[in-house]
Amino acid sequence: MTEFISKLSPLMEQFKKYRKASQKWSRDSHYKMRAFDRHCNELYPENDKLTQKMVDSFFAKRPTETINSCRQRCYLVSEFIKYLQEREQTNVIVPERPRKRRNTYIPHAFSHEELSDFFEACDNLRYLPNRIDMKIRSMTAPVIFRLLYSTGMRTIEALSLRCEHVDLTEGVISIVGTKGYNEHYIVLHDSMLELMQQFNQKMDCIFPNREYFFVSKDNVRFNSSWLTDNFRIIWDSVNSSHATAYDLRHNYAIENINRWTNEGFNFYDKIAYLSKSMGHVTLESTKYYYSIVPNLSSIMMNQTIETFDWIVPEVNTDEEIY
């Protein structure tokens, strides 16, 4: 039975199966497609073929939404239209969306000393014996921040990790069901795996059947403010520069790219692997990092002319990097 209700449901189901087979269907995809489905059913209940009017009315920016929100809301429908065009199932044209406001944020460039001081501070958090919340904080901070640093995971992905998705035998984390992002797998470094195993054993003594890997004293997952606040407090205790927990993800990408500059490599293969491991929907999103690595374009030109032109074109920033 179809989950869609409009007369376009057969086409939507067809599109959904295609995206699932391509590993490009997430929970957020479901919500966005259902929104367009309801739009079609409410305003065009008798239409069993896609029309320009149906699409244009959906793409119109709403008074209550930002330009970026409008672009995100319409992105999947754009892909749906392109999918139908390629199969000659529609003549509808993808409407031009409002230009996205570019993010001018420059991630913090961590120094070795800053990171060393930060992780040392994490390892030496003190707690009172009768304060379970402080004890859990002292156990969690060294592990979750090292996890972000060593894997490039999004902060929301780390906070949303369920125990069932963390394979501590093989050292593989499954990122599934995270709103708006592709499902993917992350392989842990041996040292990170050992930390995760030790942490899990300690947490099992407190909450034997917990659902989430990282939980508070109430046995519920931490919220984003807990991660943000604790990173800031610990960071500010040993460093004077400004940085955020999400900068650890940026650092992961940039460090990988910098390491490649001293190797013989195929840029396309490397960036494809990095893109997949970071859960980017498209390679275009991974290319963002090339714009913030100093002098990378000249290094690339010297090492590989073949893929230089592929990297250099303007980056499509439809996918959020945050």
Q: What is the role of each PLM region?
A:
Residues M1-Y322:
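Conserved catalytic core of the tyrosine transesterase superfamily
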